[in-house]
């Protein structure tokens, strides 16, 4: 506020901060969950006692919510212990932090009902004066993040189970439909050389970058692609995109325009096609333009004989999915 700093690291963006600068792309993701004492599950929400670690990101968030029934402690293990002894009813913590602290204290973490709240991206906050004097700073900084950021962020086992419980069977039904298997099989009759694949991919990418989209639009209105879009609507934004490929990784059907034509050089294809996995989740990715977190879910497409003939990749809006599943569980 006093214009004395160019920025600071690491932080999350609050509504108060937004007028003073911008946040970089995430360097790290925190996975915030509500943890409730078992005896407080049915307690009147207006009477809940909350706990928080002093000076934490969660403490800053609580201030913005005007929650006054708040016990502040000095450490992560202390807040978990306070919940364990029922001095508070509910805490908001990163999932891994809670599990690790509970394990260190010899507390059974699974005994505490939990519900997903949100992902919190942590990055470098650049003040307006830094951005004004160095307009390209954030763009260049964001480009270097993959080289120095921690390991990719993956869904927890419990989160994967939640998503699969809702999506796996409908996806299996989708990829068994003749309109999908026939499209993949027909494309497999046209095998391209590596050189031809590269040329086709480059052509597609060039068109997308120049907003031509001729190749992509032609594919977007095939029967198989239209079927994907119709199927996708039932999930009300949880599924953000669908790509069906043949056994070479070439696009066969798409629910929206994709950035490239050939998926064969990407993990979402190569680690699923002709492999033993029934499905695969990729790492969670952050879309800075939409502020959404997405994960790719991939499954092999098989013919009636059980042979692999392609792969389906689905983009899943993780926050929307987990919130939806939590709400359904409560109803």
Residue ranges and their predicted role:
Residues 28-33, 104-142:
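Periplasmic-binding protein-like
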Residues 46-47, 52-57, 121-161:
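Extended ligand-binding regions for polar small-molecule ligands
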Residues 37-67, 71-73, 79-81, 96:
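Bilobed "Venus flytrap"/periplasmic-binding protein-like clamshell domains
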Residues 150-153, 157-258:
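Extracytoplasmic/periplasmic sensory segments of membrane signal-transduction proteins
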Residues 213-229, 257-286, 330:
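Extracytoplasmic/periplasmic sensor domains and loops in membrane signaling proteins
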Residues 292-328:
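Conserved beta-strands of PAS-like sensory domains
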Residues 1-47, 54-56, 99, 110-119:
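Acidic, polar ligand-binding/catalytic clefts
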Residues 1-6, 77-97:
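Short helices/loops that flank or line small-molecule/ion binding pockets
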